Amino acid sequence: MRIPRLKLVEIMEVNGVKVFFHWSVLLIGALILLGAMEDPRIAFTVLAAYYGVILIHECGHMIAAQRKGCSVSSIVLYPIWGITCFSDPYSRYDHCVIAWGGVAAQAIVAVPLIAWVEIFGYTRFPPVNAALAILGFFSLSTGAFNLLPIRPLDGSIAWRLLPALLKRRPTRPIKREPAWRSWR
């Protein structure tokens, strides 16, 4: 799937893959920061953490796709979702693994942060607390939401993993020798 680059702003490169923002992300971010005159540090932290969650999710897809031998052309971040553009996977199983990659990446980041907050509590620094809440609790809840088996969410593909795993099993069981013969 090719995305027209006219309305995109390149922001970085991750593992050889260009990452773009849609222009609306910058506009919405600027409007939120303008409206947050009381404490712009918290507003900036929340925005950065929010788009960090989307980037972490898309990087999870990117890593899974690259591990499965797909070429990844770009990652595009929109105000409420992201898209990782990669070549067609070799199999249905590979496509399911790539779908799980985004949620797995979110969980790898979120679970330790949630454990930290549950064990030690929040800090006395409001911007750090905002980052912990977004990258931890919010990220895990959006990851769970993303696993709903509804298009266009990842769950519509990810939950096909079990049937794909069963299909990969050999049709005939491997023939084994009886245990009493194997001692020779």
Which residues does each predicted region cover?
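Hydrophobic transmembrane alpha-helices and their immediate loop junctions
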Residues: M1-R184
